[in-house]
């Protein structure tokens, strides 16, 4: 079984229907044009993802998370992944402000769901249900992903709000397990979400690196401490 290495993670298959997901210290932005390494980033993303998966599981949302397998490793259920990214937006930011005549920071009257085709060569283009069908993803599967994505949003938006954080937007990925269930996969971390401090509107996510807003590790550590109630130990 081959090890897959992406920009931010290694996927190491095991022979018991499980996978090791190893988080790297690498940071990339703008489709890999900007790159750097930050010691401790992998640990922070692994621990934040594990914590948020537990929050979702406690709310009845099925994920691929099984447990923590070391500082920067999670054990997860092996899934047959869909070639899609599902983006949920609560506040105008990022690419959305270029597509709608709304100011950055405007709270949306309801969440916006977007689908993107995962393909680096094509720049991960936005697609609709017709494109998805051509890619082999049925309408019922899309509706199930959308339903779960909105459930995730309801749980996490409330969870973060209680901790003084705005969940601006986030990316999810889904796969199908051996029982034919559509399950939340990948990660939920400041690499894949936009988090703003509710008072200052400071970024607590990868935008800190993307736009040179400050120290990435400090931002991730602040997020970790807010959501877990524990001070992180520098790695």
Curated annotation (Swiss-Prot):
It catalyses: 5-amino-1-(5-phospho-D-ribosyl)imidazole-4-carboxylate + L-aspartate + ATP = (2S)-2-[5-amino-1-(5-phospho-beta-D-ribosyl)imidazole-4-carboxamido]succinate + ADP + phosphate + 2 H(+). Keywords: ATP-binding, Ligase, Nucleotide-binding, Purine biosynthesis. Pathway: Purine metabolism; IMP biosynthesis via de novo pathway; 5-amino-1-(5-phospho-D-ribosyl)imidazole-4-carboxamide from 5-amino-1-(5-phospho-D-ribosyl)imidazole-4-carboxylate: step 1/2. Its EC number is 6.3.2.6. GO terms for molecular function: ATP binding; phosphoribosylaminoimidazolesuccinocarboxamide synthase activity. InterPro entries: SAICAR_synt/ADE2_N (IPR028923), SAICAR_synt_PurC (IPR033934), SAICAR_synth (IPR001636), SAICAR_synthetase (IPR050089), SAICAR_synthetase_CS (IPR018236). Belongs to the SAICAR synthetase family. This is Phosphoribosylaminoimidazole-succinocarboxamide synthase. The gene is purC.
């Amino acid at each position: 079984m081959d090890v897959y290495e992406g920009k931010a993670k290694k996927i190491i298959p095991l022979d018991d229907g499980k996978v090791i997901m190893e988080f790297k210290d690498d940071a990339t932005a703008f489709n890999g044009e900007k790159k750097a390494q930050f010691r401790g980033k992998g640990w922070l993303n692994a621990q934040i993802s594990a914590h948020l998966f537990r929050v979702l599981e406690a709310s009845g949302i099925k994920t691929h998370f099984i447990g923590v397998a070391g500082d920067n490793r999670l054990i997860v259920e092996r899934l047959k992944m869909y070639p899609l990214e599902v983006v949920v937006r609560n506040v105008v930011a990022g690419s959305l402000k270029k597509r709608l005549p709304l100011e950055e920071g405007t709270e949306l009257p309801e969440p916006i769901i977007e689908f993107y085709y995962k393909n680096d060569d094509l720049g991960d283009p936005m697609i609709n249900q017709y494109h998805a069908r051509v890619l082999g993803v049925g309408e019922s599967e899309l509706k199930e992903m959308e339903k779960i994505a909105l459930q995730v949003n309801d749980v996490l938006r409330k969870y973060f709000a209680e901790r003084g954080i705005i969940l601006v937007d986030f990316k999810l990925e889904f796969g199908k397990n051996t029982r034919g269930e559509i399950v939340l996969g990948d990660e939920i971390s400041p690499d894949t979400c936009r988090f703003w401090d509710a008072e200052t509107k400071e970024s607590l996510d990868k935008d800190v690196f993307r736009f040179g807003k400050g120290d990435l590790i400090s931002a991730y550590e602040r997020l970790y401490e807010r959501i877990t109630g524990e001070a992180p130990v520098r790695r």
